[in-house]
A protein has these predicted regions:
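Active-site beta-loop-alpha junctions enriched in small/polar residues
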Residues: 69, 91-92, 117-119, 166-168, ...
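Hydrophobic faces of well-ordered beta-strands that scaffold small-molecule active sites
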Residues: 60-68, 86-88, 112-116, 161-163, ...
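Acidic (Asp/Glu)-rich catalytic clusters
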Residues: 102-107, 154-155, 225-233, 260-266
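A conserved glycine-rich beta-strand in the N-terminal activation segment of trypsin-fold
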Residues: 24-33
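His/Asp/Glu-enriched, well-ordered alpha-helical/loop segment
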Residues: 253-337, 344-353
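Glycine-enriched alpha-helix->loop->beta-strand junction motifs that scaffold or abut catalytic
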Residues: 82-84, 157, 206-213, 231-236, ...
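Divalent-metal coordination cores built from histidine and acidic residues
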Residues: 76-166, 170-184, 188, 237-239
Length: 353
């Protein structure tokens, strides 16, 4: 006689899914749901558990837009638009902290990580831009001033420090100050994100120890040797669609070429849109996904770009879900990802009963 399947303890339920992405594709799977936690149990084939609901599609950690400016948009539609978490890379500290708090308590509000104010050289970008209030910017000229700015971001619970290196008509840090700011941030335990614009700025950032480029370099075509150096030292936030918003431009072509070679060289790509910069959709940007696909990223690489910090075994609070499994046709991958929804783990059984 076959043994009856085990009964889940009170508060636990088991669900199945057609596929699960946890830094890699797990295939048909069984997952255990306990409150707001969803844990991968193992392959569906041969499982001794008895799922009480089936998720008809693929489960991911919550999709992240790794470059937004929530002070320039209404973030209310992000979760409904398929984005579970954002990294705000320039904002008023008090305002972005309020949005962080909302994301921690409201199921329909996007989860927020943030860098806080932009740290730049005196007169540096974006102090000359109308869209950037002075409260968004810390202009620093000395190591003492940069230390104070970094300490302010740390005290505000920032997840990163953002610096700007825009040499197109604006001052940038000297080599000494650049390395000083990066070292101070690292000593405080925070990664450094840099805005690199103008000849040589991406390579300056990498040489100084910057961790993440806020944009794919678009003002110059980098050499293969430079691309290789970047691939071994930084990750890049894509932001391709801002160069034309679906229209062909020289900047889009340069950035796409740089990102294609960067990804082929093994570089880490993060999905990001620079939301707030022009006519971009609130939520998943299908044009950005199509640009990533055209740059050579396959389904696994796009998943990795959308989930930059994947768990190896579990999800908390929310998941991203796409009906079906990743298509075998490369031309269909981007549109498949653009259909993602954000779901609360606590409601999965009711959603898919």
């Amino acid at each position: 006689m076959n043994a009856a399947p085990p009964v889940a303890p009170a508060g636990e339920t088991y669900v199945s899914a057609d596929d699960v992405w946890l830094g890699g594709w797990r295939g048909p799977s069984v997952l255990r749901s306990t409150g707001n936690i969803l844990e991968w149990v193992g392959p569906l084939s041969g499982s001794t558990e008895a799922p009480t609901a089936h998720i008809p599609g693929t489960v991911f950690g919550g999709f992240t837009d790794s470059h937004v400016h929530l002070g320039l948009v209404d973030p209310a539609g992000l979760v409904a638009g398929g984005i579970a978490r954002v990294l705000d890379l320039g904002n008023n500290l008090d305002e972005v902290r309020a949005l962080w708090g909302l994301g921690e308590t409201e199921a329909t509000a996007v989860a927020v990580d943030y860098a806080g104010a932009l740290i730049t050289a005196p007169g540096g970008y974006p102090s000359d831009r109308s869209w950037a209030p002075s409260s968004w910017i810390r202009e620093v000229a000395t190591p003492e001033e940069s230390a104070a700015a970094v300490s302010e971001m740390v005290a505000a619970a920032a997840s990163a420090v953002k610096i700007t290196l825009n040499a197109v008509g604006a001052p940038v840090f000297s080599e000494r100050m650049l390395r000083t700011v990066v070292t101070q941030a690292h000593n405080a335990g925070l990664p450094v994100v840099a805005h690199p614009e103008g000849a040589g700025q991406a390579m300056r950032a990498a040489a100084a120890g910057v961790d993440i480029l806020a944009h794919t370099p678009w003002t110059e075509r980098l050499s293969d040797d430079e691309i290789s150096a970047l691939a071994s030292s930084v990750s890049i936030i894509s932001t391709l669609d801002i160069h034309g918003y679906g229209q062909a431009t020289e900047a889009f072509a340069i950035a796409s070429d740089n990102l294609s070679r960067f990804a082929a060289a093994g570089g880490v790509v993060r999905y990001g849109t620079d939301l707030g910069n022009g006519p971009l959709p609130i939520g998943i940007n299908a044009r950005e996904l199509a640009a990533l696909s055209a740059a050579g990223l396959d389904a696994g690489a796009i998943a990795a770009a959308l989930v930059p910090h994947p768990s190896s075994a579990s999800f908390v609070e929310r998941i991203s879900w796409i009906p079906g499994v990743a298509p075998a046709d490369p031309d269909a991958v981007a549109s498949w990802f653009s259909t993602a929804s954000v779901l609360a783990i606590s409601a999965l059984k009711e959603t898919f009963a």
